[in-house]
């Protein structure tokens, strides 16, 4: 019985450890308002490759123009402060090399060293680990800061505009006649441009869909961990109640067997989902770093503390699943063994009683002679 209580404590400890580890998924958000951030991956822009130098110089001028446009049409700004707001530190700078993004499943945090007024902030992101969503929402956030409007609304609006443009472009390319006419005007020497654009948009749509699905797998993983903990507590309570009341095991066989089977399946599902999520983070980091084409690399990404936390939790979930399969055994086998032990004990008690009767019948010290014993047996 002592071993059974120790197994209860170990299973509960592992289940609580798995459950509490899921709290790291809800950091790096503005709604949670937590002092820590445990990102799945961290990225920043590079300025030491030929591609990044050309791209960022062009993008910087474009965003500076948009920033000036936003400031000029903001009627709430005092004209005496307009010159100070033209300072480069107040302009949109999402592609600055000193910016560092900490991306998590439900939000991201940004650290920008060149901005003294707002060098760190966190934003909710409902699109999971989608790096495109992070950049577009951050662009909307900075437009909201410049125009002194609600930054969350502007971030969401920019993302909606992006999705609308992608959907419209998809519908446009589905019409081969109109799509070919436009692309021939832009690139008359490339007859395969139509198919290339379709492939690019298809990859973008797949990328968005995969990130949304993986975000919901994180939610499902949290729910499964909670169910595992509740079923484990219920299973332990049923075992203790059975020990106290000494009720027949057959009455509890079906319930206990069902709990054992469900908990086993949930533990395996938890470990499998976590493993798939880790593979996605590793693949995403590999794709962002663009290891194959170093000259085209404009972003450098690395695993964050949340990713390492996921890897550690995967091994904990794996051990928990093994312990569930080892200790949460169905009660049919246990009841059969208990019944066999009870029957063998009853047979041994009966044989011992017969031996004592024969011994007392043949023992002179008991006051009974052998003749009396013979007459008693007859």
From Swiss-Prot:
Q: Where is this region: Disordered?
A: 344-365
Please state what the protein is called.
Spore membrane assembly protein 2
Transmembrane segments annotated in the record for this chain:
6-26, 218-238, 268-288, 303-323
What family does the Swiss-Prot or TrEMBL record give for this protein? Belongs to the SMA2 family.
Gene encoding this chain? SMA2
Q: Name one GO biological process term.
A: sporulation resulting in formation of a cellular spore
Compositional bias of kind Acidic residues: 347-357
**Species of provenance:** Kluyveromyces lactis (strain ATCC 8585 / CBS 2359 / DSM 70799 / NBRC 1267 / NRRL Y-1140 / WM37) (Yeast)
User: Which keywords does this Swiss-Prot/TrEMBL entry list?
Assistant: Membrane, Sporulation, Transmembrane, Transmembrane helix
Predominant location category: membrane
């Amino acid at each position: 019985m002592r071993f059974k209580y120790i197994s209860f404590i170990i299973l509960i400890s592992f289940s609580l450890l798995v459950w509490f580890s899921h709290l790291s998924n809800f950091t790096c958000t503005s709604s949670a308002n937590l002092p820590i951030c445990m990102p799945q991956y961290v990225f920043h822009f590079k300025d030491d490759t030929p591609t990044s130098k050309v791209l960022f110089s062009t993008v910087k001028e474009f965003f500076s123009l948009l920033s000036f446009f936003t400031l000029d049409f903001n009627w709430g700004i005092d004209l005496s402060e307009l010159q100070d707001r033209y300072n480069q530190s107040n302009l949109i700078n999402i592609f600055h090399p000193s910016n560092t993004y900490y991306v998590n499943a439900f939000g991201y945090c940004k650290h920008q060293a060149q901005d003294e007024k707002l060098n760190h902030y966190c934003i909710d992101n409902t699109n999971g680990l989608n790096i495109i969503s992070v950049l577009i929402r951050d662009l909307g956030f900075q437009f909201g800061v410049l125009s002194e409007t609600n930054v969350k609304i502007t971030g969401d609006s920019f993302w909606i505009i992006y999705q609308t443009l992608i959907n419209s472009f998809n519908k446009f390319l589905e019409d081969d006649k109109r799509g070919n006419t436009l692309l021939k005007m832009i690139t008359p020497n490339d007859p395969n441009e139509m198919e290339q654009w379709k492939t690019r948009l298809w990859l973008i749509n797949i990328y968005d869909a995969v990130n949304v699905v993986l975000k919901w797998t994180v939610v499902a993983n949290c729910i499964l961990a909670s169910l595992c903990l509740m079923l484990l507590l219920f299973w332990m309570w049923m075992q203790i109640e059975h020990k106290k009341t000494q009720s027949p095991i057959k009455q509890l066989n079906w319930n206990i067997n069902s709990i054992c089977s469900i908990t086993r399946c949930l533990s395996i599902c938890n470990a499998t989902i976590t493993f798939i999520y880790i593979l996605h983070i590793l693949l995403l980091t590999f794709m962002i770093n663009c290891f194959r084409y170093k000259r085209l690399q404009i972003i450098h990404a690395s695993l964050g503390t949340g990713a390492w936390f996921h890897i550690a939790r995967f091994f904990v979930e794996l051990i928990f699943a093994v312990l569930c399969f080892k200790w949460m055994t169905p009660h049919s086998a246990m009841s059969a063994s208990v019944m066999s032990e009870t029957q063998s004990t009853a047979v041994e008690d009966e044989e011992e009683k017969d031996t004592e009767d024969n011994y007392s019948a043949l023992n002179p010290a008991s006051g009974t002679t052998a003749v009396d014993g013979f007459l008693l047996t007859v």
